Amino acid sequence: MNEMNGENVQTANHTSEVMRRFNQAFQRHEPEALTELVAEDCIIENTQPAPNGSRHVGRQACLAVWQGLAGESGTHFEPEEVFVSGDRAIIRWRYFWGAGERNSVRGVNLMRVRGGQIIEAMGYVKSSS
C-alpha cells in the first residue's frame, strides 16, 4: 500500500469513528456527546424548508440544531446505513416521533469531517407531499 492510500485509510477510519459517535448520540439521547464532534466552522444545510433547507453556520448554531433533536423525548433515530470514503460520509436513516412507520421520515445526511470534527452536513428527506 502506498503512503497516499494509507492516509486515505486513516482518514476514513477517523471519519467512521466520528460518524459512529454522532449516530450514537442520537440513539442514546445524549446531546452533550455532540459537543466535541462539531467544528467551529461547521455548516448545516437542514432538510427543511424546501427548496434549500435552513442554513446554520458555526459551532453553536449547529449544536443548537443537533442537540435539540438528540435530546427530544419520545423520538428515536435509526441509522440504516453508513458509507464512508475518506473525509466524507453518507448516513441513510429513519427518524421516528411516534409508533410505526406512519410517524417517521427517512432521509440522508451527506457529511464531511476534518480533524475529527464535522465541518459540513447536508440533510435530505423523503417528503409526503
Question: Model features per residue range: what roles?
Answer:
Residues 12-15, 49-50, 129:
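Proteins with a high burden of low-complexity, intrinsically disordered sequence enriched in S/T/G/P/A and R
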Residues 1-40:
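Short, low-complexity N-terminal intrinsically disordered segments enriched in polar/charged residues
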Residues 2-10, 63-129:
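A beta-strand edge to alpha-helix "cap/lid" segment located at domain peripheries
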Residues 22-25, 45, 76, 96-97:
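Alpha-helix C-capping/helix-to-loop hinge sites
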